[in-house]
Structure formats: C-alpha cells, structure tokens
Amino acid sequence: MSDATAASGPDWAPNDDQQELIDTLDGTVLVDAGPGTGKTFAVTRRYVNLLRSKPIEPGDVCLITFTRNAAAEMRERILDRSEASATTIGDAPIQTFHSLCQDIIKESGFDAPQLLGIDDQITADTRVVSNEIVEETLFEECYEQFRDAHPEHAAILRTVEDPGEIQGLIGELAAKGVFPTAEGWYRGGEAALEGDREAFVERFAALNEPRNGGSKQSRLREMLSSYGDTGLHLPDAPSKASVRGEGKQLPGEMAERVFEADREPLQRFVHDIYIAYLRFALSRNYLTFGFLQLFAFVLLCEDESVRDQVGFEYVMIDEFQDSSEIQFKLALLLARTENICVVGDWKQSIYGFQYADVENILEFDARLDRFAAELNADRPRIEYDTSVDRRIELSRNYRSTASIIEFATAALTTPASGSEEVDAEAVTERLGDLETAIPGVESRIEAIENDDEPAAILTAIGEMVDNDSYAVPDGDGGTRSPTYADIGVLTRTRDFGRSLQAAADEHGLPMAYEGGLEIFRTDQAKLLLAWLRILEADADRGWAVVLERAGYDLGACEAILETASYPDAMVAFRERLRATETLPGVMRTVFDRYGCTGPRAAVLIDTIESIHANTTLTRGGLVGVIARGIEHGTTQEIHAGAGADAVTVRTIHAAKGLEHPIVILANMNSGRFPSSGGSSGNISYEEGAGLRQRDVYAEADGQPYIYRDWKTEIARKCRPTAYDEERRLLYVALSRAQRHILCTAGGRPNTFLEELPVSLEPGVVDIPSFETEAEDRPVFEMPMPEPRGPRSSTPHELGATAEAAAGPAESAGGMSFGDRVHEFAEAYALGDPVAPANDHEEAVASFLDGLSGELRPEEHVHLPLEAEGQQVTLSGIIDLLQITDEAVAIVDYKTDADRTREESYRRQLSAYYHAIAELFPDRNTSVSLFWTGSGEQTEIEPLTRAEVAGFALS
C-alpha cells in the first residue's frame, strides 16, 4: 500500500484540511488539491456527508469526473460508506461530462438539433463515436462530400493539406462554446472568431519590449529575422525592413495592422463545413463527444423546463483543471443553487490538446462571474449568487518525501529553452504550502546522460532492483528493497517507450509498455495492408512485404516481382482471400495464417471493423486509411492483463493519477521534451488573434499561387508558447514518485535537465543478466494503487483461476463478435428496431420473444462482501434481468463454441445471484446461461455467499 492511498482508507482519520472540505457543504467552494493529498478520499467523504446531513437523495447530487474509471472508483468508495442502497448509488449521477450529456440528450434532447436550425433529430439509437480513428475516417468522408458540394470555397480548400486540421478546429471551437446555426452563429459566437484586440495588442507589446534595459532588440523583432523566408508574400505585403523597423523593436502601429484582417471569407468557410459536419453526423446517426456537449448545452440554454428537470441541488467537479470552457458553462446550467464545489490543481493541468483550459481554475472567480453574465445576457438562467464562499487547500502530501516535493516544485519555474524568461515570482504566488506527511525519509534524486540511453536505463534498473540503497515502502510502515514492479519509466513521447521496450526484450528485462500504441504501425497492420493491396490494384507493394516476411532476400523479391511468378502457396492463399466475402473474414484469415493473436490483433480487428461498419468506404478505401494510419502514427489504447513483476513504461500523460516508488523520467533530450511542437496547420484559432489562415490562394499578376499571409505570420509569433503546460507536465512526472527519481538523457540533455537542481552525471552501460523471458512480458495495464480496507472487484474476476485452467474460450467469432451479439441483445430487449444479423442473434431474439414480465438489459449490480476481516465490493453488469411478480431470473449470454468455462461462469453468476436476492427478498431468484450458438439455456446452482466471498478475497 502506498502512503498516498493510505489517506483514502475507510479507517483513516481525515486531516484538518480534508475535514474542512468534508464539512463544508453549502455555497461555492474552490479546492486546491495537490498531488498525493487524498482528494478522492475527501471528495467521496463529502458526498456521503451530504447524504447524511441534508434532506436530499443521491439523485440531487451531481459528481463529475473526467474518466469512467475515476467515476467507478468514487462510486465504490461512496457505496462502502453510505447507507444508500447499491441500486440507488449505482443509478446516481456520478459520471463524466460526456456521459451526463448523453443522458440529458436521451431523456430530453431528441429535437436539440432544431434549436440550431438543423432539420434533423437525435434518435434513441444514435451512437457515440469514441474511437478516434473511426471519427477521423468519418470526418474525411464528410470533408470529401463538402469539397465536391461547395465550389465557392475552392480557394480555401486548395490550401488545406490535411482534413484533420479542420476536424481539430471544429473540436476546439465546440469546446469554446462556439457553435454554428443554419443561418449564422449561436449566441453571437462569431465575435470570438474575430479575436480579442486588447489581449492581442497587450501580448504584442510585451514581446516587442526591448530587452536588457533597451540595449537588446525585442524578442518579437528577433523572431521576425526570418520574416518572409518561409513563403512568398502577396505583392502588397510590407518588406522585412519596414516590419522590423530600424531600432530595437517593431514600429508601434504594427500591432493594430497585424490584428486587423478580413476574416469574413474564412469565417464563412468554417461555418459551412462546421454545420455540414453536424448534419453529416446526424444523418449517419452518430455524435462525437464534442457534439454531445454541444447539443446538451444548447438544450439547457434554450429550454428552461429541461434545466428545471435535470438541475441539481449540489454539483461537485473533480479534476477541474481538466475542464473546458463549455464544461464550465454546462456546470453552471446544471446547478440550481450556488452549491458548487470544484476540486483541482492548476499545476497538473496537462490536457490542453484535449481542450482543457487551465484558466478555468486559475481565474475561477472571474470566469464564474463572466460566464454567468454571458449566460444571462438575453434572459435569466443563472439566478444564484456566483461569489466564492470558501477556499480550501489540501496541503498534506501522503505520497512523496520532502525532497521530491521540493524537486518537483522547482520544475514549475524551470526554463524550457535557453532564451526563455520564466516569471518565477508570479508562479510562486500561485503555489500553495504542500508539505510531506512522511518526514525524515531520504530520497535519491539523480540524473544521468549517455549516448546509448536505453542501455544506460537498463543498467540503472539492474542496479536498483534488490538494492537497499533504493529502499521503498513495504506497506506496513517499514521499507524493503525494490522489485521491478516498483519502477515506472515515464516519457514525453511514445516512440522512446517502444525503443526501451525493445531493448528490454533483447536483454530479458521484464518490462511492459502500457497505454496508447500506434496500432497501424504494428507488424499485424502492415501484413494486413500488404494482403489488402494484393487483393486490390497496388499488388507489387503488397507482394514485396509478404515475400520479405517469408524470408526472400532483396534479389529474389525483385526477380519474383519482375516476372510475377509468385510462390504457389501464396497464390493459393490470395485466391482463398478473394473468395472470402467479408472484410472481417479476410482479416481473421490473414492473422490466422501468421499466428497473429493477442490484444494487438484484437484491437486492430475491432478498429477496422468499426471503420468498415460506420462508413461507406470500400476495401480499397480502407487500404488508404491503414496507409495514412501508418504515416501519421494514429494511436489506440491496448491493455492485456499480466501479473508479472515488471517495470512499466508509460507516457507522462498516461501516468496522471498514478504513482511509483521509483520514477525514471527518460528521454529528457533536446527537441523531445519539451515538445518541439510543430505547425498548427494552415487554418487555426487563438483567442487573441482570432481565426487565421496562414496560406492563401490568389492570382497575383495573373499567376495562381499559394501565398503566405504576412499578418498571420507575425500573429503566430505572438501566440503564447506551450512551455507552461510542458512545465506542468514535468511537474506531474516528478510528482508520481514516492521515494526516488532518476532523470535520463541520451547525449543531448534538454534545458529542463540542465536547469533543474540535480547533478547530471555520465551514465554507465553495463547491462546485467536478467532472467525473465521476453515472451512472458506482455503489454499490461498497471492497476491503481490499492487502498486500505474495502476494495472493489468484478464478478468476472472470480473465474480467473478456473478460466486459466480451462484455457481461453473458443468463441464463434472472437471478442468483437461477442460484443456485437450482446449489443443486439440489449437493443432487442429494449424494443429498438434491430434485426438479427446471424444465427446467434436469431437465437437471442427467439429467446427474448418467449419471455414475459419486465426485461432489464445491462443491469448494474453491487455486492458488498466480508470474510476473515477483509472487505470487498463486487460490481458488475448483468446481461438480462427478467422480473415477474413471483420471480427474478438472471440470464448471461455466452457465444462460446464449447462449455469448458461453465464453472468459472458459475462463480460470476453466483455473485449476481446474491446481489439480486438482496434487492428482491420476496421473490425467487434464479440464474442461467444462454448459449447463443445452440439456443440452449443452462440453469446454474449458485455458490453460497461465503464461497463467493472466499473466491473474491483469495
């Protein structure tokens, strides 16, 4: 158990700061909760205290988190301490913004598009597209249709190289609350596109101020030494000399000249493609996360009855530093009273690329008043007092030592480049008084550099493991020598993590890369692309990959390609693929041939099936999608459970909320961290400069050409850098450490590493012998640190031992097939207009048609258990609950081709049995398995509650 999570155990007495939050129930409350301060513990205790102290129900309290895992954890903690029933807490609005918006729309928002003048509706079966690759593919299809249908925008479209930049712009505007209507912009949103003159001029002036007391030219003038070098300006653009001026700074009037721009054609283009994308999504019966929030916001703004219906007496928002502008405004509309509590830490705001706005928490008071005034501009919507009643600081860190806290805090004032000047005084004023709860413990904080950085890291890990000099907490108040699992390697970018994983595999060090993988760059994807190309017109590129994989050298490959005399076995396999009618069939046939199994192949199949199912792309079109995915490095989350004692590797973003006894912060190299960034695309938006277009198509002097817009070139030099967020990212990485930190670089240390208060030493390369075999080290998901006292689990985990003995179930079509059958079963039970697509679904439909009573698909249940002084709460989802006056039947669908795992399913269903028996004590409860392949139903004799508890706690 970690020190940080000890503060969240049920018997842990709250400290004074936590108790203040728990007891402060009314008014607007702003909580500064630094890393390791037990905020989840305090927030969930406050929730329980609300239910005990106020005449309210769980449905009157809205608790917003930013991930489903966080919501589930909070729900479990609340359930462990609340007198409310498991069903009541299970149904309570403890969820993400996106989930809450989806509920609002499903309940009251089918006509929401019409509020924007869109003649379409959201339906009961409108799906939410959460897969980024699927969303990108759908938008590209929309973009192609738009380009063909809107020749009036041809000049702008000629300058767009990547449709993804337009998709990103739409997402950014949606997060800002800028929405189109059929005829214009919602609630004057076009004003935001014009920019903020005062803010732009102020920033321009600050950058244009001469340095060193006037003896050195301004930073802006220095940056514009390359003005005009990267693109040809239109003939009427000013010269470099006139822009930069003769002195140490740009001429004073230049700020106004740069800000003024004719944005009308660009605004019209953005409006038209934005509204076209909304219409396209509705016509395809899907919404994105951004559109969920968009329509929920419009609905709450325009329909007072909906606000009254869904409003809450108490609103609590966790991780508020991760909120966007539209989410802040949604929170105001969801609150009936001033009882709003936001909890967050500006130092950990690292999701700007997902439209999080750190100013929401830094300028909470001002934004609270401003957003309320904006919402009340045309009629009263926010009628409660928006003044902040209480500020609370959680200042006791249960995770890290004093030296680690001090070292991490230094990151917030560390320059990111040699020329950057950090306003350390302003940063220090914002810092709270974070103190350690584990005084007197020494930490090792070290830094090394070596040209062979991966080898140096492996050497360092070998030195740390089983070394008492790197002692870590043992969970009982003492210390022990570290294991591999105590070490977490964090990187700014994924590519280094993959390189390190490869080095670890080569030397036998147990290591697992966790998180986003560039799925289309895997061997599985490249093989699939090769065979799809062979089936299409681009055969040579496909054959080259396949032949190389088969072991043919370059000369042999060239000879085969030149004569088209392909090996007979490969030709036969090609014909077999041609005879395969479906794309999923082609994929599985390819993967079966090459023995591609495991999570990577499964995620790849699921991703491509989703693209195929949700778009009109042909097989040839999918070849293009995979090829672009390889080029762009599109990522997808992959998790494969593993219980190995292994070092974990993650990006810093993926490590948010986690902790490790030892943190190795790797790849601290120039150009890698801080991120060197890159072009923001041709069309971009920034609050100060407004909507801008860098490259413009024009015919100057009768010659068509794409010119560089001189005003945008200068305006982009005035944009705020992302260095503040990079510093916060550095802070997050360092504050994951409990006891020790090692920073590493590969010969080009970045400014961060050079400026941090740590001695940079030469790294040693002397890799020891490791015992673990590479094949025993799959990618896996590191669990959250386990809290003291009651823990949570799922009924599925009860069958782990039996499943391991029986081996993996042989499904009729794999996990994605099973998911589709379950989705059909849920929709059919709800009465949705769906038709069976295969024999399994036919069997499900026939089974459901024969049932009487109330049918509840996908029913969430919770079962608290206790045995030998230990506690655990099982949570799960029942496929189908059939309720009649006399009985309650639990049904679990199984697509397995055989019944070898029936015993493991018995354990799972037994947990469901006891949970439901508690809810319906006056009715007979039964459990059964429905085998979709045969249409047979098997009654299950449930285990006793004590037996279930024994398995759960074993």
Residue ranges and their predicted role:
Residues P58-N208, E359-E363:
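Conserved P-loop NTPase-based nucleic-acid remodeling module centered on helicase motor cores
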Residues V647, R748-I878, Q882-I883:
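Nuclease catalytic cores
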Residues S2-T37, F41-A42, D60-C62, E161-M316, ...:
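Accessory N-terminal region flanking or inserted into the helicase ATPase core
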